[in-house]
């Protein structure tokens, strides 16, 4: 069973210094992959494959361990550069579902705040990896740094592992077409809605998940009722797409056309929203959790002079989406 847990560190922050509280190590042993896992690209998948192999190796020696991913919320760059936060690749909930589908046992979330940013490498290892997670093996990327001012290196981690009884495995970066696969690269391809490139870099279609919420019913008055899903601010991708929606029926996905963005024709500085018009569907599904898979980019968002002009464009978008989805059946 997949477990999502939020770690609460036993520390006090007093006058700029951490007062560390040791606690008795308890709970199951773990193999732990550390990272932001922003976008879950091929490099992240290589880390998770190494995690599985380490778990199997330890299991063969009689050491049963949970496969755990240790990640951070918010992204550390949001904490250090609040005025220039990185574009989000996946909403948090979608990332959780993707990790669950990969067969992990556990996702542990550590709140990235002033206390965590001030931890020395030694405090992080002792309190988080040893005391809290009871780690027997750690998997990180080859450029991993940790602790206050990024003062801890892989060598630091390996030296502490020798003393404290855990293994450390550094995984090399994955290359694709002579370019390092990274979250920054994913953001670049998403900003131009290059869905084939995203699939090459992650091994899967781009998808978004959430609960269907009530909207303004504007689409219904125009003849295009929609499912509405709230999206996080600063999502890296926007536009009009042909989509498949999962979670509505057991027989498979329902096809449709989706608008992802701020709807500049109907709202000024509107909230980020995913609106999906389903083909051949007339059931009410408010509150239901769905997964929307983006299959093809149709066009960028644009502001129309009036609703009738927008409606005529939506008819063209629907026709293009239907045509694409029928050809790929």
Model-derived features: positions:
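Glycine-rich, Lys/Arg-enriched anion-binding loops that position phosphate/diphosphate groups
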Residues: 161-262
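Conserved beta-strand segments of alpha/beta enzyme cores
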Residues: 3, 105-108, 167-169, 291
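Phosphate/ribose-recognition catalytic cores of enzymes acting on nucleotide-derived substrates
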Residues: 2, 215-329
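Residue-level signal for inorganic ion chemistry
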Residues: 41, 99, 138, 198, ...
């Amino acid at each position: 069973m997949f477990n999502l847990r939020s770690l609460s560190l036993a520390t006090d922050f007093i006058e700029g210094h951490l007062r560390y509280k040791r606690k008795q190590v308890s709970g199951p042993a773990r193999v732990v992959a550390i990272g932001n896992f922003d976008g879950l690209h091929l490099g992240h998948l290589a880390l998770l494959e190494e995690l599985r192999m380490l778990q199997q190796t330890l299991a063969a020696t009689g050491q049963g361990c949970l496969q755990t991913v240790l990640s951070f919320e918010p992204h550390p760059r949001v904490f250090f550069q609040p005025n220039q936060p990185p574009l989000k690749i996946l909403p948090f909930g979608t990332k959780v579902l993707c990790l669950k589908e990969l067969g992990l046992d556990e996702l542990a979330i550590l709140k990235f705040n002033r206390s965590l940013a001030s931890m020395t490498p030694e405090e992080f290892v002792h309190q988080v990896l040893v005391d809290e997670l009871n780690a027997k093996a750690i998997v990180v990327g080859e450029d991993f740094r940790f602790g206050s001012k990024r003062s801890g290196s892989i060598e630091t981690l390996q030296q502490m592992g020798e003393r404290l009884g855990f293994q450390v495995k550094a995984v090399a970066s994955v290359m694709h077409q002579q370019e390092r696969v990274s979250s920054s690269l994913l953001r670049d391809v998403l900003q131009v809605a290059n869905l084939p490139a995203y699939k090459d870099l992650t091994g899967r279609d781009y998808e978004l998940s959430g609960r269907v919420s009530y909207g303004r019913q504007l689409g219904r008055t125009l003849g295009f009722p929609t499912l509405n899903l709230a999206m996080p601010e600063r999502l890296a991708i926007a536009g009009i797409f042909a989509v498949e929606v999962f979670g509505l029926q057991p027989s498979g996905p329902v096809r449709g056309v989706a608008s992802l963005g701020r709807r500049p024709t109907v709202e000024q500085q509107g909230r980020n929203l995913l609106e999906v018009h389903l083909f051949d569907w007339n059931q009410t599904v408010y509150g239901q959790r769905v997964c929307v898979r983006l299959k093809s980019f149709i066009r960028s968002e644009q502001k129309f002079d009036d609703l009738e002009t927008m409606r005529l464009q939506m008819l063209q978008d629907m026709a293009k989406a239907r045509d694409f989805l029928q050809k790929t059946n």
